[in-house]
């Protein structure tokens, strides 16, 4: 027996070589022995021929370690030294010599408060200590790796920096909270890595880092060490303005975008735009069209293109398809400098079963429920988060904070909220488990959503939290202290379904379905609704909006323009999916660019101009937004004219805000001498007319000017005779010189 072998006790050397010794920090590295009278250094370096200990303070050699065995175990005492010091290992390999700062000499970098909040379920910044983070310890720079895997037998970090050797960097286990960590000097930015986990049954699985801030694109799935240099923000003016804005009283016209298919480049459109391309083309386009916000479909890294991002694996990693995290930040910064907000679709309802992802992460159902009646989503064959587990709540809460704080995003739109709220969602009897009170509500998910919204609104000024919720669940946008979920807005799925159904009917039969456009006002003030025509309505065989409308091309385009006019006049914020603003003919295909060539044709140009002018009018006149959620902001003039399929109403603002009158005709009949009530006396004029030749219409209208008469009508003291264009929308307002000059539409 050599002297070196005496440094490994109780078979620890054999256990280490077999991967069975998990408390490696108690064995490897520098340790005091003989009651503090000596120091020993132990290391495990495969293929090493010689190892010397070098002082980091002066670069001098302190000692040479003895080889314990051919497998790569080395150990040795350090002469008379008894006080620990920072050191490197000078390792001689067959073809090279390397100086390696031994990671096993460093203590834990975790603090008690972080660990407590993470386990409790209230950590807002878990990404600062989990994942891969650049740190400096005793003037030594490196990457701190940390992962939650409480049921793993052993966890190692493997990557480019250790030739993917699972024995090289076994991590420190914190048994009490299930975290594993290691601080690695010498790692370079851009290094690829994974966590190598040994399960209790002995199986080994390589997993992507759940907290990775960058990942490879599919089909590869390694995590990537982030860059040290971060984007320098220049959007202070926007952020200050955002914080002072009450968005429920402000205009919000949202352009929904899937970055991979808005435009493409390459000879055959086979290449994605990168973030610089999007800065140069998407932002000016959105600005010109007058939208206030862009809503991005999910950008968290996802392996399957056909999921459109709604089955993410790297929840913290912006997809590498379009560039890195700094590129994404630069895009958002440029949007803000152009006074365009950016919202993000956020998927917290489920996650996919890709083996490198969260599924059975440490050999157990860590993030999901064990019982498939609670843990599996029947529609998408995905897994449902365990919202009752503190660490899972912290994982999701921190992720929401990460996007909003680190990327300056202006809000999140939560996908598939209905599937979170109900335990029996898309399940037959016997396929679900009731809650503790025997009900169908998912109480843990409800509590999580309330906590999420309450914390985000308190911590991050001026953001918008938006729910895609398709049921009649009460109080989605009510405050949490009133037992609501606490969202700022809810998609109005009822209005969307009813109005699109109406749109698809032949004009001659629309009179029998008049209530499909009026019914939404019966419940418009029960929630803070957002009118959304999203990607879901123009895919999976549903056809484009233009395709849904019966008739010849003239009728299709005219009807679509009138529909948009009705939508922009209806109370509630607006969202429109890309391509709909110029009446794309085919339904959306995520593998191809939008059909921009259609803009060579006048009808498509006309719809685009109409949307642009609607947005300009919408942003200019407070009556169209300031009282969206107050009944006094809207009044029907006539909601019962089903015979003519004409809808007329007034939008009001506050104080001296100019009221606007909308008249929408959903048949191809021209109505001349049509009397309409007006909210005040004096001259009125057409602010916008969707039948104008400017938009591809037949130019039926009122010559721009309407003379009000002191004849009460429709509950108004004044009225006028007007011409209502076929399949058209008129927007009327007081004909004051000041307003006309300012509108300049």
From Swiss-Prot:
Keyword flag Electron transport: no
Q: Which GO terms describe its cellular component?
A: cytoplasm; cytosol
| Superkingdom to which the source organism belongs | Bacteria
Which SUPFAM superfamilies would you find in this protein's record? (Trans)glycosidases, E set domains, Glycosyl hydrolase domain
Q: What class of enzyme is it?
A: transferase
Q: Could you tell me which SMART domains the record lists for this protein?
A: Aamy
| Name of the molecule in the record | 1,4-alpha-glucan branching enzyme GlgB
Natural source organism: Shewanella oneidensis (strain ATCC 700550 / JCM 31522 / CIP 106686 / LMG 19005 / NCIMB 14063 / MR-1)
The top of its lineage is: Bacteria, Pseudomonadati, Pseudomonadota, Gammaproteobacteria, Alteromonadales
């Amino acid at each position: 027996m050599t002297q070196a072998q005496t440094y490994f006790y109780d078979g620890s050397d054999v256990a280490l070589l077999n991967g069975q010794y998990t408390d490696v920090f108690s064995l490897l590295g520098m340790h005091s022995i003989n009651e503090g009278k000596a120091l020993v250094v132990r290391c495990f370096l495969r293929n090493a021929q010689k190892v010397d200990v070098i002082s980091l303070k002066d670069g001098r050699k302190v000692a040479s370690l003895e080889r314990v065995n051919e497998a790569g175990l080395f150990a040795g005492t350090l002469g008379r030294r008894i006080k620990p010091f920072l050191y490197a290992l000078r390792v001689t390999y067959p073809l090279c010599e390397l100086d390696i700062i031994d990671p096993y000499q460093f203590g834990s970098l975790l603090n008690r408060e972080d660990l407590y909040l993470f386990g409790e379920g209230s950590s807002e910044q878990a990404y600062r200590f989990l994942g891969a983070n650049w740190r400096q310890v005793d003037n030594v720079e490196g990457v701190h790796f940390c992962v939650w895997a409480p049921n793993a037998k052993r966890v190692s970090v493997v990557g480019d920096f250790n030739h993917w050797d699972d024995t090289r960097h076994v991590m420190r286990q914190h048994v009490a909270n299930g975290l594993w960590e290691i601080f690695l000097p010498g790692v370079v930015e851009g290094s690829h890595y994974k966590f190598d986990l040994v399960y209790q049954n002995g199986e080994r699985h390589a997993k992507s880092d759940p907290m990775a801030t960058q990942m490879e694109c599919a089909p590869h799935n390694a995590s990537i060490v982030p860059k040290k240099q971060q984007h320098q923000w220049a959007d202070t003016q926007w952020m200050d303005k955002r914080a002072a804005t009450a968005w429920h009283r402000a205009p919000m016209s949202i352009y929904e975008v899937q970055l991979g298919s808005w435009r493409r480049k390459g000879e055959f459109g086979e290449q994605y735009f990168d973030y610089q391309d999007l800065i140069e083309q998407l932002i000016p386009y959105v600005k010109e069209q007058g939208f206030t916000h862009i809503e991005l479909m999910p950008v968290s890294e996802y392996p399957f293109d056909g999921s459109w991002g709604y089955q993410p694996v790297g929840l913290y990693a912006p997809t590498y398809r379009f560039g890195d995290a700094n590129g994404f930040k630069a895009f958002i910064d440029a949007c803000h400098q152009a006074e365009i907000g950016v919202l993000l679709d956020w998927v917290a309802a489920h996650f996919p079963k890709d083996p490198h992802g969260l599924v059975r992460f440490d050999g157990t159902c860590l993030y999901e429920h064990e019982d498939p009646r609670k843990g599996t989503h029947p529609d998408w064959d995905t897994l449902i988060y365990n919202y009752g587990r503190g660490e899972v709540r912290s994982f999701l809460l921190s992720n929401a904070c990460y996007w909003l704080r680190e990327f300056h995003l202006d809000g999140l739109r939560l996908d598939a909220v209905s599937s979170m709220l109900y335990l029996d969602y898309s399940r037959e009897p016997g396929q679900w488990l009731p809650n503790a009170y025997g009900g169908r509500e998912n109480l843990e998910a409800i509590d999580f959503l309330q906590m999420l919204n309450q914390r985000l609104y308190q911590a991050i000024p001026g953001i918008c939290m938006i729910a895609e919720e398709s049921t009649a669940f009460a109080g989605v946008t009510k405050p949490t202290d009133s037992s609501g979920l606490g969202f700022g807005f809810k998609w109005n799925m009822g209005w969307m379904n009813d109005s699109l159904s109406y749109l698809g009917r032949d004009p001659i039969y629309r009179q029998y379905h008049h209530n499909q456009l009026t019914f939404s006002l019966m419940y418009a003030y029960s929630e803070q609704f957002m009118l959304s025509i999203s990607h879901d309505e123009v895919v999976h065989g549903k056809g484009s909006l233009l395709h849904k409308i019966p008739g010849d091309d003239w009728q299709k385009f005219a009807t679509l323009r009138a529909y948009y006019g009705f939508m922009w006049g209806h109370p509630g914020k607006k969202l429109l999916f890309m391509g709909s603003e110029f009446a794309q003919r085919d339904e959306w295909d995520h593998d191809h660019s939008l059909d921009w060539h259609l803009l060579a044709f006048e009808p498509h140009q006309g719809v685009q101009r109409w949307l642009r002018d609607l947005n300009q009018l919408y942003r200019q006149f407070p009556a169209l937004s300031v009282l969206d959620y107050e009944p006094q902001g809207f009044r029907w003039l006539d909601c019962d004219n089903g015979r003519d399929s004409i809808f007329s109403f007034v939008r009001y603002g506050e104080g001296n805000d100019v009221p606007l009158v909308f008249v929408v005709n959903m048949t191809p009949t021209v109505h001349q001498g049509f009397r309409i009530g007006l909210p005040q006396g004096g001259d009125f004029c057409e602010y916008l007319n969707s039948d104008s030749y400017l938009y591809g219409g037949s130019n039926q209208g009122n010559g721009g000017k309407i003379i009000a008469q002191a004849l009460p009508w429709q509950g108004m003291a004044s009225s006028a005779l007007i011409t209502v264009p076929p399949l058209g929308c008129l927007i009327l307002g007081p004909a004051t010189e000041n307003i006309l000059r300012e509108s300049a539409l």
